Curated annotation (Swiss-Prot):
Residues 117-213 bind DNA. InterPro entries: CheY-like_superfamily, ChxR_N, OmpR/PhoB-type_DNA-bd, Sig_transdc_resp-reg_C-effctor, Sig_transdc_resp-reg_receiver, WH-like_DNA-bd_sf. It holds the Pfam family Trans_reg_C. Changing residue 205 to A: Significantly reduced DNA-binding. Residues 6-108 form the Response regulatory domain. It comes from the Bacteria. This is Atypical response regulator protein ChxR. The keyword RNA-binding does not apply. It comes from Chlamydia trachomatis serovar L2 (strain ATCC VR-902B / DSM 19102 / 434/Bu). GO terms for molecular function: DNA binding; DNA-binding transcription factor activity; identical protein binding; protein homodimerization activity; sequence-specific DNA binding; transcription cis-regulatory region binding. Changing residue 186 to A: Significantly reduced DNA-binding. May be a global positive regulator of transcription. Binds a cis-acting element of its own promoter DNA sequence and is hence probably also involved in its own transcription activation. The recognition sequence is 5'-WHGAWNH-N(3-5)-WHGAWNH-3', where W is A/T, H is C/A/T, N is G/C/A/T and the linker length in the middle is 3 to 5 nucleotides.
Amino acid sequence: MAGPKHVLLVSEHWDLFFQTKELLNPEEYRCTIGQQYKQELSADLVVCEYSLLPREIRSPKSLEGSFVLVLLDFFDEETSVDLLDRGFWYLIRPITPRILKSAISLFLSQHSLHSVPESIRFGPNVFYVLKLTVETPEGSVHLTPSESGILKRLLINKGQLCLRKHLLEEIKNHAKAIVARNVDVHIASLRKKLGAYGSRIVTLRGVGYLFSDDGDKKFSQQDTKLS
């Protein structure tokens, strides 16, 4: 990605944020500081006080595509679990400028290494990965984080087998027992939501799934062999 990464710092603790900004290389990071989180504002990373997150961002039905690092004043198990379940990172005070600078650098470096396209087109449809939304000629289809992760992996590897164990990695669930059956449930939901294109998700029984390039092609278990 060309140019410096945009980091939006949202807090009422201006000293911490200005000191952190001083530690970040301006050639690598462009920091803007404000006291209000604006959902429409584009940024590679939003660092925001939990108390300043808008209600809709905290709600379970909010879009989870925004990369947000949340700052907590104290540990609360329910809050921490909720944030993790929705894909947010968080830090708990005390937080120094050096700690915040290191967290920002680590977050953006890891996401650069594992970057995915912002959108993937299949047929007349466009899957907006970060927004967890598929735009179709009939309208918008909203996906859960797990459905989005599975569809992303299938489309990136279109026409190729995706093993069940790899699709399990896309399930956003912190339950101790995540079994192969979870993949089948999310696949069934995806097929319904994608309508006619749901039939492109082909089952290779006992092995995994693939997203077919050819809607007219019929697959069987023997069509793909593992090496």
